[in-house]
Amino acid sequence: MKPSIILYKTLPDDLLHRLEAHFTVTQVPNLHPETVAQHAQAFASAQGLLGASETVNRALLEKMPALRAASTISVGYDNVEVDALTARKIVLMHTPAVLTETVADTVMALMLATARRVVDVAERVKAGEWTESIGPAWFGVDVHHKTLGIVGMGRIGMALAQRAHFGFTMPVLYHARRRHQEAEDRFNARYCDLDTLLQEADFVCVILPLTAETRHLFGATQFARMKSSAIFINAGRGPVVDENALIAALQNGEIYAAGLDVFEQEPLSVDSPLLNMSNVVAVPHIGSATHETRYNMMACAVDNLIDALQGKIEKNCVNPQAAG
């Protein structure tokens, strides 16, 4: 008899068939309490859980006593109570490698769009404001040869440094929990403390996961240390930044502009002051959102769950100690 799993994300037919070759699959729209209650027997017997963007917490795990592995279609897992999974010897699988290049492309796009005011001037053209040769009121600032400061030198940080160093001749500074010798050797990146990075960088790019240590890592003090000409990019997690402090820094001219893929509350409220600022490029958490990469993420998550329920957790496992 095949193990049973809960699938809470719509998959392409070929990936669904791959799952069904290994498991009895119950598809549900979400993990809300009413959904769990409606499918109580399926949740109670499920050994696997696969999906994205829903909260996986202790209350859910209480309804899933047979659960052995959870697979998230994402690299981040701040919506999952990992400690609760580990305590129950449930492994958590994620998809870190397949989205690296695409997210780095998004960060680079935010840097370019924000610096060159692409969104703002495009909207002005559409509004009929381009009636004569443009002047300084339409100008942006250069990206090439500017100093890039990367906060978080993981896979995505490395991919961004590669683009900046080789493609735009940008000196690279970085701050991370530990020095990254490969970044220093390949991109001549310079490790520095956060204050130094903030004071010297023309672009400050945040690519950090959300943890207790990184929550509101960027607040009024940090923005005050940045150049008034600096551009701030957040492509990590929204709550890493105190959004009210960011809004104040933009309104007061403490920093030049911001490109934001993530926010403290998502979706972003329609009455957020950020939406009325011409020096803000705001996009809806599109970091990995290409057709190709999202398919590859789903395929990776499917394979991760198949492997995990066969005891193979050598790669892409967040908490391998849970299998001990």
UniProtKB/Swiss-Prot annotation:
Keyword terms, alphabetized: Cytoplasm, NAD, NADP, Oxidoreductase
GO MF, any single term: glyoxylate reductase (NADPH) activity
Work out whether the entry's keyword set contains Transferase.
no
What GO terms fall under cellular component here? cytosol; plasma membrane
Q: Which residues form the active site?
A: R237, E266, H285
Tell me its EC number(s), please.
1.1.1.79, 1.1.1.81
| Gene3D superfamilies, sorted | NAD(P)-binding Rossmann-like Domain
Location comes to:
Cytoplasm
Location, primary (coarse class): cytoplasm
Q: Which reaction does it catalyse?
A: glycolate + NADP(+) = glyoxylate + NADPH + H(+); (R)-glycerate + NAD(+) = 3-hydroxypyruvate + NADH + H(+); (R)-glycerate + NADP(+) = 3-hydroxypyruvate + NADPH + H(+)
Pfam families, per database record = 2-Hacid_dh, 2-Hacid_dh_C
Q: Tell me yes or no: is NADP among this UniProt entry's keywords.
A: yes
The record's annotation in PANTHER family points to: 2-HYDROXYACID DEHYDROGENASE-RELATED, GLYOXYLATE_HYDROXYPYRUVATE REDUCTASE B
Tell me how this protein assembles: Homodimer.
Q: What does this protein do?
A: Catalyzes the NADPH-dependent reduction of glyoxylate and hydroxypyruvate into glycolate and glycerate, respectively.
The record's similarity note reads: Belongs to the D-isomer specific 2-hydroxyacid dehydrogenase family. GhrB subfamily.
What's the name of the protein?
A: Glyoxylate/hydroxypyruvate reductase B
Phylogenetic placement of the source organism: Bacteria, Pseudomonadati, Pseudomonadota, Gammaproteobacteria, Enterobacterales
